[in-house]
């Protein structure tokens, strides 16, 4: 699974005022190197791309806040890409596999391992930079030599867990190390709700079989939204409802919520929209400076930790728009009223407690060409449909965010293995297999991993050399 780490830095370049083709380095001014890449276009002329290089990497095509930056990225480092994973099939224990994984050059990933002796392990795979003088969260100059990368984390220093007391391992794109780990891995990990829910389900299982783990992957419990449900409960007291009777349906909506994000779940749509509205309004004063520099700026980190802290403390100094609202209570009432009105208008409802989650949460899978050729979208895209799950559910499914694969397989029990994939096995829109797997993936129906009897054969024949000349 994805580490959600930070393996790219934008190095702010200091240009020589007397020669803009030179940039500052710890060794003084250095000239950019220039190279041309040729992009072959099928059926058309080759395209030439001019690239300026620095000692840290290529200069980005777009400036950052008006200034040039270089891309220092592990993926562009020859040392970070190799075929080391081919040795994994020689591993005979988790210790062998750990040695292979931690030394392989590949996109950084979470690696979970198990062996025939019952040992299990987790680690990171891929090259992760060792930073000096910076944590990678902002763009800075490396010209003075006090900041930059000093290399990659040595394989033996990569974090790992072997045979944990719980007897299982969980990886859900969340942070896997604590503050004692000396190296920066990232800044924008997924929050821990999905990982916590997976742990809860595994802890409760006495025996683990394939249907149990498929059911786990289809779990739609969303504990993240409980905070916002309780916030509405505290806000809408009988006294407040007497003054704002139009909000009674909001109280009824959250009381009707079953704690899940199923298609027919009531209340979770209101909680989702309320959370989104609160985040936009509460963070607006803090992000104003960012948006003055870049109107398209979007805060894309773990918003719930700071948001919940601000909503819990309700300090007068952090009240959004104090000229308009006397206190946090007035602000929260306004946000809830606006959220209810917006949902009713957007979905044509007379009551917000009638809004089912599937009306709001719809899965959209579009082919890249459908945006450029809209008329063919109906043949290229998967049908838009109501979907269970959410961004914080184990069954992650919200808009364009969804599980790209579900699989449950146990060695020596391949006949019981389960596999899900969206779309189909063919990439050809006219093939009967273009979308033949989508229904089972969408509805969570058990689908065998093993192919079974062949029903279709596809033969690849190399093009004759004469045809290529």
Task: Describe each PLM feature range.
Residues 1-469:
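C-terminal/peripheral segments of proteins
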């Amino acid at each position: 699974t994805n580490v959600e780490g930070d393996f790219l830095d934008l190095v702010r370049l200091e240009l020589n005022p007397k020669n803009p083709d030179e940039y500052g380095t710890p060794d003084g001014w250095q000239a950019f190197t220039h190279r041309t890449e040729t992009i072959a276009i099928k059926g058309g002329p080759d395209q030439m791309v001019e690239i300026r290089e620095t000692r840290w990497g290529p200069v980005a095509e777009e400036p950052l806040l008006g200034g040039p930056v270089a891309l220092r990225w592990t993926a562009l480092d020859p040392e970070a890409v190799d075929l080391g994973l081919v040795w994994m099939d020689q591993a005979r224990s988790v210790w062998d596999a750990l040695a292979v994984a931690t030394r392989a050059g590949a996109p950084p990933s979470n690696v979970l391992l198990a062996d025939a002796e019952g040992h299990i392990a987790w680690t990171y795979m891929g090259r992760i930079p060792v930073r000096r003088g910076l944590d990678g969260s902002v763009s800075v100059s490396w010209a003075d030599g006090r900041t930059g990368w000093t290399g990659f984390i040595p394989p033996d220093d990569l974090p790992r867990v072997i045979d944990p007391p719980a007897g299982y391992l969980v990886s859900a794109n969340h942070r896997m190390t604590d503050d004692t780990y000396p190296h920066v891995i990232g800044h924008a990990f997924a929050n821990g709700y999905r990982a916590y829910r997976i742990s809860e389900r595994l802890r409760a299982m006495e025996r683990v079989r394939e249907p149990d783990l498929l059911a786990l992957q289809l779990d739609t419990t969303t504990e993240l939204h409980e905070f916002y449900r309780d916030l509405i409960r505290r806000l809408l007291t009988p006294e407040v409802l007497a003054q704002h009777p139009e909000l009674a349906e909001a109280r009824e909506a959250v009381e009707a919520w079953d704690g899940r994000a199923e298609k027919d779940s009531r209340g979770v749509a209101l909680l989702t929209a309320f959370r989104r509205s609160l985040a936009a309004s509460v963070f607006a004063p803090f992000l104003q400076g960012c948006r003055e520099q870049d109107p398209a700026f979007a805060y894309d980190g773990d918003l719930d930790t700071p948001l919940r802290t601000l909503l819990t403390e309700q300090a007068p100094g952090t009240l959004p728009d104090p000229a308009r609202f006397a206190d946090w209570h007035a602000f929260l009432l306004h946000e809830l009223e606006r959220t209810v009105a917006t949902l009713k208008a957007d979905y044509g409802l007379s009551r917000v407690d009638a809004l089912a989650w599937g009306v709001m949460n719809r899965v959209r899978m579009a082919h890249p060409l459908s945006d450029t050729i809209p008329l063919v979208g109906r043949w290229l895209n998967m049908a838009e449909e109501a979907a269970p799950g959410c961004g914080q559910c184990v069954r992650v499914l919200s808009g364009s965010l969804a599980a790209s694969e579900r699989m449950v397989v146990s060695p020596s029990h391949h006949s019981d293995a389960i596999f899900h994939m969206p779309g189909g096995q063919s990439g050809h829109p006219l093939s009967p297999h273009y979308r033949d797997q989508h229904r089972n993936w969408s509805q969570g129906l058990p689908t065998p991993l093993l192919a079974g009897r062949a029903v279709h054969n596809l033969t690849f024949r190399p093009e004759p050399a004469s045809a290529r000349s």
